[in-house]
């Protein structure tokens, strides 16, 4: 349409590490959002917890002792196409452009299975921030619900069953509130329909 598109996307996101105490231009490896926390812990010289499955993206640089980290997250700032549909490309971003001229960026996966969402699903802030902080892939609600429906545990959910039994016993009404959509990153029509079964 020729207009900037600002919805959730499957774009990779840029990742940059600057060491102000070094003249070295750091080149982080490509990875996913789960790799940010382990990279920060490496900079701080803190051992990565066993539950963090992400990796350190800066392998060949010594940061030294007693370092501090400033993490800046540009939420929604992905690497889109260099055309009129990309608001970052269309916008005036002189500081960002200068960073690109001086430093080396890597690209991180921020959608789909890389952040605990369904295959091919666009990323969102909630999934992104959970993965950044956890240092591992955190299965999101839609993935957990789909798994529960597949293995049958969804239909054995004690709270759901108690509510349905109470409504049946009291000849009452059960109101289901949910997102009736097939494309939202925050819900799907499948879940309230599954409760009706």
Model-predicted segments: where are they?
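Feature captures the catalytic ectodomains and active-site-proximal regions of enzymes
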Residues: 1-197
């Amino acid at each position: 349409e020729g207009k900037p598109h600002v919805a959730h996307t499957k774009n990779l996101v840029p990742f940059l590490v600057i060491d102000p105490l070094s003249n070295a231009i750091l080149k982080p490896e490509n990875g996913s959002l789960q790799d940010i926390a382990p990279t920060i812990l490496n900079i701080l010289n803190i051992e990565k917890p066993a539950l963090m499955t992400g990796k350190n993206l800066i392998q060949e640089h010594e940061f030294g002792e007693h370092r501090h980290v400033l993490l800046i997250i540009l939420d929604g700032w992905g690497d889109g196409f260099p055309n009129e549909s990309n608001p970052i490309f269309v916008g005036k971003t002189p500081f960002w452009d200068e960073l690109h001229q001086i430093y080396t960026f890597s690209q991180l996966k921020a959608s789909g299975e890389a952040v605990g969402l369904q295959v091919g699903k666009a990323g969102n802030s909630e999934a992104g921030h959970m993965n950044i902080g956890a240092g591992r892939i955190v299965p999101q609600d839609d993935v957990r619900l789909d798994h529960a429906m597949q293995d049958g545990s969804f239909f054995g959910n004690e709270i759901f069953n108690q509510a349905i039994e109470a409504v049946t016993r009291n000849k009452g009404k059960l109101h289901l509130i949910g997102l009736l959509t097939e494309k939202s990153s925050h819900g799907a029509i499948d879940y309230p329909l599954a409760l009706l079964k």
